[in-house]
């Protein structure tokens, strides 16, 4: 958010620019007390994105976010959980797997490309259907 404010202040974002924030499904999905602070920060990021999108749409500066749920990364594989816990977590996803890093990249590339020229203020949820339940 601070970087975006500085870019705007210094007029470094030209017309026809696109800004994509990497947020989280936690910002739009039910949370537990274990990750409430994380969810609040992601909800705040999404609110900032929508406000910036509305404020700068007339200059054709687009703001969007990619909101992934669990992504299969090295960091995720280093979390010490049992196979039973992992299976219980995966059971929450209608598509029975975690996301892949390249799926986040593809959504981001789309939002930065001309293919999404009419897209602003949008959160793309990459969550295997998690937020449907």
Residue ranges and their predicted role:
Residues 4, 41, 49:
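Active-site helix of classical SDR
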Residues 28, 67-78:
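Short, flexible catalytic-loop segment of classical short-chain dehydrogenase/reductase
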Residues 30-39, 51:
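Active-site loop-to-helix junction immediately N-terminal to the catalytic Tyr of the SDR YXXXK motif
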Residues 93-104:
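A conserved structural motif in NAD(P)-dependent oxidoreductases
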């Amino acid at each position: 958010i601070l970087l975006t404010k500085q870019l705007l202040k210094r007029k470094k974002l030209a017309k026809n620019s696109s800004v994509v924030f990497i947020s989280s499904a936690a910002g739009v999905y039910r949370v537990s007390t274990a990750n409430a602070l994380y969810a609040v920060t992601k909800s705040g990021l999404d609110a900032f994105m929508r406000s910036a999108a509305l404020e700068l749409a007339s200059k054709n500066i687009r703001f969007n976010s990619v909101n992934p749920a669990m992504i299969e990364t090295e960091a995720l594989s280093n979390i010490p959980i049992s196979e039973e816990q992992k299976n219980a977590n995966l059971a929450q996803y209608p598509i029975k797997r975690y996301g892949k890093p390249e799926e986040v990249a593809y959504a981001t590339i789309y939002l930065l490309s001309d293919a999404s020229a009419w897209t602003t203020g949008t959160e793309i949820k990459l969550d295997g259907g998690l937020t449907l339940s």
